[in-house]
């Protein structure tokens, strides 16, 4: 399953071409919409402070809670089918953070600091 955004989609198609595993677009894997913070540097103090407000939609964006809801719902669906298949999710750092929080308890600080490198492979078992 892959995000509809170009880099993730290209990566998933490459993986599919090499492995023969079918790839399918999953709209819920799209990165969080950061509203007024979209296309701004992620390391800035103002952005870091804004991320502490989990219920804030960043003036037209998507709150952390809404993001978690859509990813948790997707993971619940995958879990229901996990006896049948193994899934590869190709997505973004914000999505990886939510997936990590689905499988492991995290403090707010751990959640905010969590990240994976581009094309990293992380395995989770239900």
Residue ranges and their predicted role:
Residues 2-3, 69, 90-91:
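Short beta-strand scaffold positions
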